[in-house]
Amino acid sequence: MGTLNLGSVSLSSSGTTFANSAASVTDAPAGSVVQSATTTASGAVATSSDGPNASGLITTLTPRLSGSKFLTILSGVNAHSNKTSSDNHGTVYYMYVSVAGGSYANITSNVIQSHHVDGALGAWIDVPLTTTFLSTPTYTLGNTVAFQPYYARATSSSGTVYFHHTGHSAAASQVYNLTVLEIAS
């Protein structure tokens, strides 16, 4: 009935039968999602350390193509501020990567997301956090590539800093996740 062309790959149909001219994933045109992986967790994650601190939420995949880009999507997190407890103004978030089981390193030299409340709240507040980040880590085919969000205090203080806060009963079982998409480049 019709043909969809994506670069050198064609997808055609006649009735309910589809034909794909791609011989393998290596034929995927630039910008195509090659694979995805998701890790889901629940429960509060917190520390009294300034950071950056590992969140423990790790998503790992083995790239199918050389030179791919990776889109990380962190969602469902409750960012937290508590102005009644040692001036906990909020949290900054980073994305770290480990290649072939090596040490985790910041993908960028900076923060990828932050949550900050300046001023006296008189109470605590949770704010929904979703963040995406596109990166191109260096790897060799066959290596695993593991992504993990890290977090740190938004300001100097001595209170607890939260990656994910479950301060009210409805949030106690709330899930959050990290999805990673491998994208052909």
Identify the function of each model-found stretch.
Residues 40, 44-51, 64-185:
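Terminal beta-strand-rich extracellular "head" domains
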Residues 53-55:
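Secreted extracellular polysaccharide-interacting domains
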